[in-house]
């Protein structure tokens, strides 16, 4: 990955609220299935904005910090996804999204961010991201003190 796209907590909440507006009316949904771990925070934000209390998870492992690795389904919510929103933070190459589509063929699959290779696999997303860009999510970062330039002389 050559570029990095840094996401702040404020940006994430704004994007999640935009996505929630597109998911109205709320009465059409039975619940949310968040893809662990990237979809956990967006799932919580959507649950709050839509007033949805039924939240479950599907646990799929495909990343090890900066590297993609073999896909493993560790745990899944029951059913075919009918009436459920499945949410992840992003769709990248489409590997995880393809697995989600196979597990939950009737779900409405959404992400906050989408890269070109994975876009066709989601029903909706908010932000386009170039394929060669790594997304730094706010839960993966910490705030640190940076001394003024004049002190580094």
Curated annotation (Swiss-Prot):
Stated name of the protein: Xanthine-guanine phosphoribosyltransferase
Subcellular localization: Cell inner membrane
List of residues binding GMP: 69, 92-96, 134-135
Membrane topology label: Peripheral membrane protein
GO cellular component: cytosol; plasma membrane
Pathway the protein contributes to: Purine metabolism; GMP biosynthesis via salvage pathway; GMP from guanine: step 1/1; Purine metabolism; XMP biosynthesis via salvage pathway; XMP from xanthine: step 1/1
Binding site for 5-phospho-alpha-D-ribose 1-diphosphate: 37-38, 69, 88-96
PROSITE patterns the record matches: PUR_PYR_PR_TRANSFER
UniProt record, GO biological process: GMP salvage; IMP salvage; purine ribonucleoside salvage; XMP salvage
């Amino acid at each position: 990955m050559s570029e990095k796209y840094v996401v702040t907590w404020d940006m994430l909440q704004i994007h999640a609220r935009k996505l929630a507006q597109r998911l109205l009316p709320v009465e059409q949904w039975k619940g949310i299935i968040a893809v662990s771990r990237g979809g956990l925070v967006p799932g919580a934000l959507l649950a709050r904005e839509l007033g949805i209390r039924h939240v479950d998870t599907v646990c799929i492992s495909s990343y090890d910090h900066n590297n993609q690795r073999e896909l493993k389904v560790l745990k899944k919510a029951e059913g075919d996804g009918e009436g459920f929103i499945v949410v992840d933070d992003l769709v990248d190459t489409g590997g995880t999204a393809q697995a989600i589509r196979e597990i939950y063929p009737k779900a409405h699959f959404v992400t906050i961010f989408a890269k070109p290779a994975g876009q066709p696999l989601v029903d909706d997303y908010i932000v386009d991201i170039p394929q060669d860009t790594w997304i730094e999510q706010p839960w993966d970062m910490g705030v640190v003190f940076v001394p003024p330039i004049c002190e580094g002389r």
